[in-house]
Structure formats: structure tokens, C-alpha cells
């Protein structure tokens, strides 16, 4: 299987998000990369489902809470930017203050 660098990045994010979900199910707090991956995956999948950029910018800020991440992680992540494929093309989605 020949994948483009973009496709490899998408797969890596999806896999990291799966790991993050499993850890949350076990009650383990997420680290920085896991938190980024979980929010990013939410945005990518939401775009595929037909949600709008505005909806994802708002909803992306409520995917995980401060209680679900390790100390200091929420302060480290001010914005998350994700290129997502929507029905009408690829767009950049920015989630401000993604961990509240």
C-alpha cells in the first residue's frame, strides 16, 4: 500500500486518538500528544460527517476537560489547527482553548 505523507499523518493521528480513548476509558490522564490527537481526530471525523467549520471550532473545545489531562497540559495547548476534508474541499479548522 502506497500512502502519501498526508495519508500517513492522518493514520498516525487516528491511531494516537485510539490510544487516547483507551487510556481515558481506563481512567488514565492524557499527555500532550494524546490530547492533541484526540481533538484533531474529532475534527477530521466531524468534517467527514458533514459538520461545518464553525460547528467543529466550537465543539472541538469540549472533547476533553482539564480533569482528563496531566497537570500542565491544558496550559500548553492554546490552539489546535487541523486540515480537514469537508464535502466541498479541504479547510483549516482552528480550535481555540481546546481543553477547558
Curated annotation (Swiss-Prot):
A molecular function GO annotation: urease activity
Matching Pfam families: Urease_gamma
EC annotation from Swiss-Prot or TrEMBL: 3.5.1.5
GO (cellular component) term, any one: cytoplasm
Main enzyme class: hydrolase
UniProt-listed GO biological process terms: urea catabolic process
Database matches in InterPro entries: Urease_gamma, Urease_gamma/gamma-beta_su, Urease_gamma_sf, Urease_subunit
Highest taxon, organism lineage: Bacteria
Location relative to the cell: Cytoplasm
Protein's pathway: Nitrogen metabolism; urea degradation; CO(2) and NH(3) from urea (urease route): step 1/1
Keywords: Cytoplasm, Hydrolase, Virulence
Residue ranges the record marks as coiled coil: none
Gene3D superfamilies linked: Urease, gamma-like subunit
Similarity comment: Belongs to the urease gamma subunit family.
PANTHER family per the UniProt record, alphabetical: UREASE
Assembly, per entry: Heterotrimer of UreA (gamma), UreB (beta) and UreC (alpha) subunits. Three heterotrimers associate to form the active enzyme.
Entry-linked HAMAP family: Urease_gamma
Record's protein name: Urease subunit gamma 1
Lineage: Bacteria, Pseudomonadati, Pseudomonadota, Alphaproteobacteria, Hyphomicrobiales
